[in-house]
Amino acid sequence: MLEACLNQLKALGVKDENITVVTVPGALEIPFALYQLYEANDLDSMVAIGCVIRGETYHFELVSNESSRGITDMISAEAISIANCILTVENEEQAKVRVLEKGTDAANVAVEMGNLKVRTDKQLGYWSSEQTDKE
């Protein structure tokens, strides 16, 4: 998914210097990493990529629900766009079938929502002359 997402971001014209990749040990750590990136950088959009595969315990539901809730809470609290591309699947086969499409979709969503943020920031007067290089 990451490779598909990165390829699509580049195809959409996102410059390498505007892409940061951070890895974390598991899906539950993704919201924290997103928050740290948000706090340390001026970002228009972010992508959360991961995969949770159902096992034999309730852990699947917990990890799926809590990682999604953490991302949704951050979107609401910080007014930042996050394309949530954390797959929740029954098995590895399902994941393999979905990775290319979902990685590409996540990049498309991130760019579309990032562009929306830039437009609305300009309309609301949040845009500074330093940010013109990002367009």
Language model features by range: what are they?
Residues F60-E61, N65-E135:
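C-terminal binding/interaction regions
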Residues E29-G70:
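Glycine-rich phosphate-binding loop
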Residues V24, G50-V52, I86-E90:
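Short, ordered loop/turn segments at secondary-structure junctions
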Residues M1-P25:
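Glycine-rich phosphate/diphosphate-binding loop of Rossmann-like nucleotide-binding domains
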